[in-house]
Swiss-Prot record:
Its main location: cytoplasm. One of its GO terms (biological process) is cell division. This is AUGMIN subunit 3. The gene is AUG3. The keyword Lyase does not apply. Part of the augmin complex composed of 8 subunits. The complex acts on microtubules and interacts with gamma-tubulin in spindles and the phragmoplast. Interacts with AUG1. It comes from Arabidopsis thaliana (Mouse-ear cress). The keyword Cell cycle applies. Disulfide bonds: none annotated. Disruption phenotype: Lethal when homozygous. Belongs to the HAUS3 family.
């Protein structure tokens, strides 16, 4: 809806101003959200039937000058003042045929107002319920988020515990692997299959390589610093004072000093004052290097002594190993001798003493082997028990997580059911509101036809009679609705004519053929000779069914007659009701628009009533 629509409606309604209306000048009120619905309602409600003409305005001003306007601030007080022009109650009843119609209108208005108030209360109650449901849903959502956060925290803790357990499992597997390898090495060592003995000792080669690299770097640095630049003079002077300098260096230094003794005295004094500490540092570095060399020599001597000791220990261990091998061989021989000679004799004697026969064999070896197997099996069983406990713990954690998820799922189902109920209730309320809106629009459309147009009123009454025979309700419709009803009647008439032209002749021919067939069958039954044909008797169950069918047909015909009578009565009631409603509307309109004509009608009715009373008396 825009200003152009408003200007066009005002022009159609007969606005006669100084000039043509400009839509752009009326565009600014439509830009506000508060004023737009009111302007839309005004544009949708503007019609020629509810707009006063110049004659009506002049009549309104005349009523206002004469003081003949209705008294009251609302419609109820206007209803009360409708019969104020008459002074006698009997006269009012004679004029209006009792005031029941006005009371009915007033009661209907009060009922509609009460229903509107009840609907408003229900709407407020639904709004409060909606707010409560919104708060509950928000609380449920927050609870679900808290549960999700707690579940994530618990899952994080479970993951951390699983990681720690897996790390401990790896450590345990490593320890078990080392134990297994150690047991294999011990078994291999005790088996006596290899004669070699392995010993571990400290290796100083890495230390020697690092020390040589450090010494090389120190020598390079000192050579770079003391052989070139001003440090060279300090180094030469320091070398002259050292007793461990070689003769070649001394002779070279003396030759250099003899050549340039006087030039370098001042330079040496200056450099000695500047670089006095460099000589001491270099000497300390040399001393430290000497100490490191001494430590290195000591370590080398220790390494040689350790190697000699290891060599000596190796030779001694080999000698001891040879002695042990000899002792073991003698022990094997003694064992074989005992197993072959002494033990069988002792077993035989023991069997004779106990009256039993004991089989020969290495029982002690079997017992030791069984103990070894049992210990390994215990270790493996402990490992399996730990694995089983870990799996049980994980299973319990999964069950708890599944339980929490099922609880959350059930909670979501409850929320969904509540939301579905609320949605259905909201939809039903929306349907009722739309029905009320439609009813309000229908009520607004009842007075859409101009009251002064008698032709449209007649057409509308005819159509309402036809529609009341079908729907049973009397309504006032607008001109477009009248056109739609006329079009619908035309379509019904065309469909009935097509049925009359197409389907009815076929049905008539089919009925005629069936009647001819029945007549032929009856003729055959009636005129057949007694010698050639026997009478066909109807079975007893069929006779009972035919009697029941006859009773039902009689009841059906009675019901059809009652329905037809009710339809006729209803048509009469609807016909008189339409006349009464038309009379009421005409009286109401004349009261506001043409009260003089209403007074004349009242006088005529009074005269008619008096004449009838006189004739009856």
């Amino acid at each position: 809806m825009s200003s152009a629509r408003l200007c066009s409606l005002v022009a159609e309604l007969g606005y006669e101003g100084a000039g043509k209306l400009d839509p752009d000048s009326f565009e600014w009120p439509f830009q506000y959200d508060d004023a737009r619905p009111i302007l839309d309602w005004i544009c949708s409600s503007l019609r020629p039937s509810n707009v006063l003409s110049l004659a009506e305005l002049s009549l309104y001003e005349q009523f206002q000058r004469d003081g003949k306007l209705l008294e009251g601030d609302d419609l109820d007080q206007a209803y009360d003042s409708i019969s104020a022009f008459s002074s006698r109650r009997n006269n009012q009843e004679a004029v209006f045929g009792a005031e029941e119609s006005i009371k009915e209108v007033r009661d209907a208005t009060l009922a509609h107002k009460a229903e509107a108030l009840e609907l408003q209360r229900q709407l407020r109650r639904l709004q409060t319920q909606y707010d409560l449901l919104t708060g509950q849903s928000s609380a449920l959502i927050q609870g679900r988020r808290a549960r999700v956060a707690a579940t994530s925290a618990v899952s994080g803790q479970i993951t951390a515990i699983e990681d720690s357990l897996s790390a401990r499992n790896l450590q345990m597997n490593g320890v078990l692997g080392r134990l297994a390898s150690t047991s294999q090495e011990l078994a291999h060592y005790h088996s006596g299959e290899e004669d070699g003995i392995y010993l571990a000792y400290s290796d100083f080669h890495a230390y020697l390589a690092g020390d040589s690299a450090c010494t090389k770097e120190l020598n390079q640095w000192f050579a770079k610093q003391l052989d070139t630049g001003p440090y060279r003079l300090v180094a030469e002077e320091g070398k002259s004072k050292c007793s461990w300098v070689s003769l070649d260096d001394t002779s070279n230094m003396l030759r250099d000093l003899e050549k340039s003794q006087h030039q370098r005295v001042a330079e040496l004094q200056r450099l000695r004052s500047i670089f006095g500490t460099s000589e001491r540092q270099w000497i300390e570095a040399q001393v430290e290097n000497a100490k490191q060399q001494a430590i290195l020599l000591t370590l080398k001597s220790q390494v040689t002594s350790v190697e000699a000791h290891i060599h000596f220990d190796l030779h001694s261990l080999r000698r001891k190993h040879a002695d042990l091998v000899e002792e073991i061989s003698t022990l094997y021989q003694k064992e074989e001798k005992l197993l072959s000679e002494t033990i069988p004799e002792l077993c035989w004697e023991l069997a004779q003493l106990q009256d039993t026969y004991i089989l020969q064999g290495d029982y002690d070896l079997k017992v030791m082997r069984q103990e070894l197997y049992i210990s390994k099996q215990k270790v493996f069983i402990n490992h399996l028990v730990n694995q089983l406990a870990r799996h049980q713990f994980l299973k319990l954690a999964c069950q708890l997580e599944k339980k929490n998820m099922l609880g959350a799922f059930s909670l979501l189902k409850v929320i969904e059911s509540e939301l579905q109920g609320y949605l259905s209730a909201t939809r039903s309320r929306v349907g009722r509101c739309s029905a009320l809106i439609q009813a309000a629009s229908d009520v607004q459309e009842q007075g859409a036809v101009d009251d002064r147009d008698s032709f449209l009123h007649g057409v509308r009454d005819l159509l309402s009679i036809h529609s009341n025979t079908q729907a049973g309700l009397s309504t006032y419709v607008s001109a477009p609705a009248i056109i739609q009803q006329i079009v619908a009647l035309q379509s019904d008439l065309s469909s009935l004519q097509s049925d009359l032209e197409n389907s009815l002749p076929d049905d008539r021919n089919r009925c005629i053929n069936e009647l001819c067939t029945h007549i032929q069958n009856l003729q055959q039954l009636l005129f057949a000779s007694s010698t050639t044909a026997q009478p066909i008797l109807t079975p007893w169950p069929l006779m009972k069914e035919l009697d029941e069918m006859g009773k039902i047909n009689s009841k059906l015909s009675t019901a059809v007659e009652e329905v037809t009578l009710e339809h006729r009565n209803k048509r009469e009631i609807v016909k008189h009701h339409a006349k009464d409603v038309e009379l009421q509307r005409r009286v109401f309109v004349d009261f506001f628009c043409n009260p003089e004509r209403l007074r004349n009608q009242v006088r005529e009715l009074n005269a008619l009533v008096r004449a009838r009373q006189a004739s009856s008396s």
